Amino acid sequence: MPELPEVEITKRGLVPLIINQEVSRVILHRENLRWAIPKNLITILANQKIKTIKRRAKYLLIKFEAGTLIIHLGMSGSIKVVDIKTPLLKHEHFELQFNNGTSMRLNDPRRFGAVLFSKDGSHKLLDSLGVEPLEAVFNNGYLYQKSRNKRKNIKDFIMDSKIVVGVGNIYACESLFMASINPQRKAGNVSKTRYKILTQCIKDILTQAIKAGGTTLQDFSQVDGNPGYFTQTLSVYGCENKTCHFCKSKIIKIVQNQRSTFYCRKCQT
């Protein structure tokens, strides 16, 4: 699933290709993804220029004079910008064509993504989001303060988008391994010192993943079509029964809240 690094990489790849481009045509190759795609986008975005593109959590916010296009990549989505004459691929469900002869296409095989629109840039899906992990507000004391009296496990806690956004399953596993914290430990039982270490580990893991172009496990690709290379540096995620880099014991897999969790029982306490 595209997580914060993959969405950030997508945003950075789109900036030089679509900023200031004028939409000549909007095509809905299917009427719905996770939710219905607004049909009035065909008229609302016609002849509109793209002013900015930003990321909030795992959402892409594409700003026009008329409002903001909100895109979520879902479980399997990716975006590419291609020549307008390029043959349409099977799972390319939404398309913005530009006057310069290029086309931005959303590919979403599993159709859990979303294409939404807001006139003022606000949306109920954005209203309850927590802080951005790569911004200064996500500081050494933030997680500790939020975790007091929390009984949920630490992994589910840092994956809660109302607490901090964008720390998906892959990066939660990797961050907890780097911080030597057992993913089953209760969030309220983690010390302030360990939260300080975990906060920096989350920042470091996400930054490394962005530099590597994200993680490609199955469907994700960058705007230029290349895969993300952070997959090659994963320490625990997807590494069941492989050897821990540090203690040489086996990485184990458990299930937490219907998600696979990978960790080292010896290194993570």
Curated annotation (Swiss-Prot):
EC number: 3.2.2.23, 4.2.99.18
Cofactor(s) listed: Zn(2+)
InterPro entries in UniProt: DNA_glyclase/AP_lyase_DNA-bd (IPR015886), DNA_glyclase_Znf_dom_DNA_BS (IPR015887), Formamido-pyr_DNA_Glyclase (IPR020629), FPG_cat (IPR012319), MutM-like_N-ter (IPR035937), Ribosomal_uS13-like_H2TH (IPR010979), Znf_DNA_glyclase/AP_lyase (IPR000214)
Listed PROSITE patterns: FPG_CAT (PS51068), ZF_FPG_1 (PS01242), ZF_FPG_2 (PS51066)
Iron as UniProt keyword: no
A GO molecular function held by the record: class I DNA-(apurinic or apyrimidinic site) endonuclease activity
Catalytic activity: Hydrolysis of DNA containing ring-opened 7-methylguanine residues, releasing 2,6-diamino-4-hydroxy-5-(N-methyl)formamidopyrimidine; 2'-deoxyribonucleotide-(2'-deoxyribose 5'-phosphate)-2'-deoxyribonucleotide-DNA = a 3'-end 2'-deoxyribonucleotide-(2,3-dehydro-2,3-deoxyribose 5'-phosphate)-DNA + a 5'-end 5'-phospho-2'-deoxyribonucleoside-DNA + H(+)
Binding-site list for DNA: 91, 110, 150
Keywords (A to Z) from UniProt: DNA damage, DNA repair, DNA-binding, Glycosidase, Hydrolase, Lyase, Metal-binding, Multifunctional enzyme, Zinc, Zinc-finger
Pfam families: Fapy_DNA_glyco (PF01149), H2TH (PF06831)
Gene3D superfamilies named in the record: 1.10.8.50, MutM-like, N-terminal (3.20.190.10)
Annotated active site: 2-3, 58, 259
Co-factor: note: Binds 1 zinc ion per subunit.
GO BP annotation list: base-excision repair
Zinc fingers classed as FPG-type: ranges: 235-269
Subunit structure: Monomer.
Family to which this protein belongs: Belongs to the FPG family.
Function (record text): Involved in base excision repair of DNA damaged by oxidation or by mutagenic agents. Acts as a DNA glycosylase that recognizes and removes damaged bases. Has a preference for oxidized purines, such as 7,8-dihydro-8-oxoguanine (8-oxoG). Has AP (apurinic/apyrimidinic) lyase activity and introduces nicks in the DNA strand. Cleaves the DNA backbone by beta-delta elimination to generate a single-strand break at the site of the removed base with both 3'- and 5'-phosphates.
NCBIfam families xrefs: fpg, PRK01103.1
Protein name: Formamidopyrimidine-DNA glycosylase
